[in-house]
Amino acid sequence: MLTHTCLLQQMMDDSGIKNSDPDIYIYNIAPDLLTIHPDIDARRTHSINRFIEAPLEHKRTAYIMFHLLVDDLAHYGGISLKYQDGFDPHSSGYTYLRGRQLIESIMELHNIVGKNISYNEAAYRSHLIIEMVYDLVILSHIKRNGSIQLLEDAIHFTLDRKGNEFCADISWLYGIDESHVRDVLKMAASYITKERLDRIMNIEGRIRLFTDKFGLKNNNAVFAEAISTLFQNALSSIENEDFLQQTAVTIRNCGWLPTD
């Protein structure tokens, strides 16, 4: 979420657009944000064509497309005109390439607590770990840009002042009931807070997110040491911030432009 935000901030600055309303940053995280609703899954929010020509009244959906273009580069290694269906554990996307060396450790980690996990599922979880720790790699950018405070301000701005337009745009793009979209905004306003996000901007916070997501919380000391080593290795596997810069260049070259 914060990598997406930081990257869009960079793109807006590079485009010379300084005063956009902050709701664009909620559009930008919408494909992930919408999945907090129990009736909306990630396949629905990610499986749309990347270059839909939106009518003027729905022009802010361009920032949703920005998110999907970033995901394509992270997951597949290139931008696709259409959604790539099916899961490939051998994907050449950045997060899968970086995560590949973690797969065996992830399988061993689950064995410690008596849980079975397939190679494919371990590969999927490896890319999530890379995504989780990448926020820490670019933490200096996030702090310098005020990305965390921006997100908190943006969710309240969207809910309070742009809720009708946001709900209508999401409904147009995805066919999701506007009442569900408004529920998502209300739920998001309660957890996208600077206080909460600051608490998870470290290895320990990322481990908590991972264990909560996959039901792995336990008091096993061997597990605790193993998962700490796993996340430290993930962080060490990312040598620099090249993905951030290369992604910005690739998306500019494909013709994506801010709509303000």
Which residues does each predicted region cover?
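N-terminal leader/auxiliary helical segments
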Residues: M1-D260
